[in-house]
Amino acid sequence: MLAFVLGLASPFVVAAPKAAASPPAVELADTEVRTIASTALGRRYDILVGLPEGYAAQPGRRYPVLFVTDANYAFPLVRSIAHMVGDHGRGLEDFVLVGLGYAAGDTPQYSRRRDYTPRGDADARSDMPGRAPLHGEAEAYRRFVATEVFPLVAANYRVDMKRKILAGHSYGGLFAAHVLLTEPTMFERYVISSPSLWYDDRVVLRREREYAATHDDLPADVLLEVGSYETLDPVAHDPRYNRSKDMLRDLRLFESRLRAHRYPHLRIETKVVAGEGHLSVFPIAITRGLQWALPAR
């Protein structure tokens, strides 16, 4: 089981103390950690796996699989939401959850800035003393997920690899948009929350034009989400609004461009979450994303 120090509700259990002087840790039931030492990237990554209720009791059943970026934060959150909203299969279809963890030895910011961004940033600063800032390895990371993470998950868990979902927020949403425009059939569904489309002078919007110039279809189901405060305050008095990046406008522009091509196998929806900003929107966005991608059968 995966151990966390969290103040969250069931399905967490309290493990037996390892020593009399140490308080017990909080663990997430039915979870595992797999470590991949990537030869291609030269780094180690933890892959967090959460199994649905009844997984062991139904050996003939295969499950859809949700991959979520920023696992350190997103995995326990999605796990808890799936437990509560899923309501034993009545609210959501049961699924296997795979959390994509950060590289060992990196801070979360260093790892995600490198792995989730599609190009370098000349103005970047490093949050790791003695290490230069590093951005722009989203394509290498995408290949790592496809060639190393996918085989591990398929070989060890009863998943339906024809029902893969990718969910990401902020830089994770930027990475999801990169995958969508690079290899759209890598996943069947995409939950893209508050993507950092502003990155590198909106490089993803340029990639969208390049994709459209050489393709006549984009076969994927896509949910785009953003908070209503992720735009600029027209009177500049409300601190809940963004100060410089109009992420709501960028998302609308991305949506309109995708729709304009009338791709025959693209299904796209957009949800603006009222009353939420960039840091508060994800719990609601992923809840709606689960309901959209995995409705109860």
What do these predicted regions represent?
Residues 16-297:
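Non-catalytic cap/lid and distal C-terminal segments of serine-dependent acyl enzymes
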Residues 1-11:
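Bacterial N-terminal signal peptides
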